[in-house]
UniProtKB/Swiss-Prot annotation:
Catalytic activity: isochorismate + 2-oxoglutarate + H(+) = 5-enolpyruvoyl-6-hydroxy-2-succinyl-cyclohex-3-ene-1-carboxylate + CO2
E.C. no: 2.2.1.9
Recorded family membership: Belongs to the TPP enzyme family. MenD subfamily.
Name of the molecule in the record: 2-succinyl-5-enolpyruvyl-6-hydroxy-3-cyclohexene-1-carboxylate synthase
Cofactor: Mg(2+); Mn(2+); thiamine diphosphate
Organism from which the protein derives: Staphylococcus haemolyticus (strain JCSC1435)
Keyword set includes Ligase: no
Subunit structure as annotated in this protein's UniProt entry: Homodimer.
GO terms classed as biological process: menaquinone biosynthetic process
NCBIfam families recorded: menD (TIGR00173)
């Protein structure tokens, strides 16, 4: 077998194996060394390829595709520093447990560490962030070449689904000439492999004595597409309140046991004795709730469908590596405990908080008011992708009486790659992105994918000309003389020109009243800019916190 035949056999087999394990989309950043595999993916009849010239943005775009499709997605780049640009998205996928398949093309071994162009050490370059990594052999036409693909792909597949999900990395060295034989299409196959079903049982006896106590809470974070119906069933039967993070997707059911305003109450000073807490999924957004979890004496049970448990904000009393549905299904027959007073207290607090927020918002003019109006405009067919920093916190406080789904990059919690991830999700869902001006600036080039692929989404841009969240930190008062330059960081950018560059329609709103009258359109892509003031945002949030504190003084 000559070099061309060996190369063709290798890359066509590799592409076919990825398909067999569920890959249906690949994001390719153009380059020379990645030619063999890029052509293999493009030639495969059932793999959709996306082309993005910026590797950093491409990787975040792939994260969005994974979030929207619930399937693993591969990214492919050329050799050299191109691969290093994947790092932020890989870090995010590792902490968020997203099955991102990283494919870095490389120089063959004889061209490494000898000064050859576009050759850096790519072996183990993502070692701190991936669950699996392998440096593939150069195509040589032997059976061992194919065995390496079959064996290593099978090992890697355990990280594509189930409790061990996360990023994997294949480094693929290619020798020139790089063009495979386009005539050998029969080597591209489209069969699928069955993956093992994962389930574990729990020993209810370990926690039965705890579950007999009256004052229990269920706290649910990001569930990452897990089934959640058994959580609601258990909470209903046993009268236990559910403190549901917006990323849990539990809020859309408007269940009477689902509590959404807990962050505002803990911020206002809520401190109730609790006997046990069942923590499910990823850690929640709410800083105040996490602080309470750290100081409470309650018995804490952690349930996560992953072997790498997130103990933040504090190690649990006991943990279970099991899906939420399997866990609560095991508990459903436990003897009932009279918790009517307990659940009714939480329902009363929730009702009073919602009424207070609704009344407050009738006269509010800050960013939160824009966010609340947006939530009320969206329907069950819509999904929100929300940026980190202040937008995700406003969503946490204001998302109730709404059937929308909410998504965010809450692994590393960075503000980079937000636009690209949202656009990736918009391929599969009707997305509205809520983002601040600094996060938008960080990833403006991600808009290119929407432009060249006709991907429609709405962007609600909260423009306070700087880093609004820093106004809530001690630096605002303790370092006032340096605050604006070091933390406020105003840019003075006119984003209308960004919209023009990437073929988005643009509309600016200076008042909440104007936005209230606006009808959102999902025909084409739009940027709706909300001009706000950081000091005004800060003061109006403080007013709302005080109103919630007043409720606690009367109710408890």
């Amino acid at each position: 077998m000559n070099h061309n035949e060996a190369l063709t056999k290798q890359v066509y087999t590799f592409a076919s194996e990825l398909y067999a394990y569920g890959v249906r989309e690949v994001v390719i950043s153009p380059g020379s060394r990645s030619t063999p595999l890029a052509i293999a993916f493009e030639a495969h009849p059932n793999i959709k390829t996306w082309i993005h010239p910026d590797e950093r943005s491409a990787a975040f775009f792939a994260l969005g595709l994974i979030k929207g499709s619930e399937r693993p997605v591969a990214i492919l780049c050329t050799s050299g520093t191109a691969a290093a640009n994947y790092t932020p998205a890989i870090a995010e996928s590792q902490i968020s447990r997203i099955p991102l398949i990283v494919l870095t093309s490389d120089r063959p071994h004889e061209l490494r560490s000898v000064g050859a162009p576009q050759a850096i050490n790519q072996v183990n370059m993502f070692a701190n962030y991936v669950n699996f990594q392998f440096d593939m052999p150069v195509a040589d036409g032997t059976d061992y070449m194919l065995d390496a693909i079959y064996y290593q792909m099978q090992i890697a597949s355990q990280y594509l689904y189930g409790p061990h999900r996360g990023p994997i990395h294949f480094n693929l060295p290619f020798r020139e000439p790089l063009t495979p034989n386009l005539e050998r299409q029969e080597w591209l196959t489209s069969y699928s492999k069955k993956l093992p079903h994962y389930q574990k049982n729990i020993n209810v006896q370990d926690i039965r004595h705890i579950l007999k106590e009256k004052k229990g809470l269920i706290i649910v974070g990001d569930m990452q597409h897990q089934a959640i119906d058994q959580i609601l069933t258990y909470a209903t039967v046993h009268d236990i309140p559910i403190l549901a993070d917006p990323l849990s997707q539990l809020r859309k059911y408007n269940h009477p046991n689902v509590i959404t305003t807990y962050d505002l109450y803990y911020r206002a000073g809520l401190d109730i004795d609790v006997d046990f807490v069942i923590r499910v999924g990823k850690p929640v957004i709410s800083k105040k709730l996490n602080q309470w979890l750290k100081r409470t004496n309650a018995y804490q049970i952690l349930v996560q469908n992953n072997d790498k448990i997130d103990v933040f904000p504090t190690p649990p009393s006991i943990s279970y590596e099991i899906s939420a549905n399997d866990f609560f299904r095991n508990l459903i027959e436990e003897a009932a405990v009279d918790r009517k007073d307990w659940i009714n207290m939480w329902r009363t607090l929730e009702s009073q908080a919602r009424n207070t927020i609704d009344k407050h918002m009738t006269n509010a003019t800050d960013e939160a008011a824009f966010v609340k109006i947006l939530i009320d405009k969206l329907t069950k067919d819509d999904a929100i992708f929300v940026s980190n920093s202040m937008p995700v916190r406003d969503i946490d406080n204001l998302l109730y009486n709404s059937e929308v789904e909410v998504y965010a990059n809450r692994g590393a919690n960075g503000i980079d790659g937000v636009v690209s991830t949202a656009i990736g999700m918009a391929v599969h869902k009707k997305i509205t992105l809520i983002i601040g001006d600094l996060a938008f600036y960080h990833d403006m080039n991600g808009l290119l994918m929407a432009k060249i692929n006709n991907i429609n989404l709405n962007i609600v841009l909260l423009n306070n000309d700087g880093g609004g969240i820093f106004s809530y930190l001690p630096q605002k008062a303790s370092a006032e003389a340096y605050f604006e330059r070091l933390f406020g960081t105003p840019t003075g950018l006119n984003f209308e020109y960004t919209a023009l560059l990437y073929d988005f329609t643009f509309k600016r709103f200076n008042t909440v009243a104007d936005f209230t009258q606006e009808k959102l359109s999902h025909v084409n892509s739009h940027i709706y800019e909300m001009v706000t003031n950081r000091d005004d945002n800060m003061s109006q949030h403080q007013i709302l916190y005080k109103k919630l504190s007043g409720i606690l003084n009367v109710t408890l």
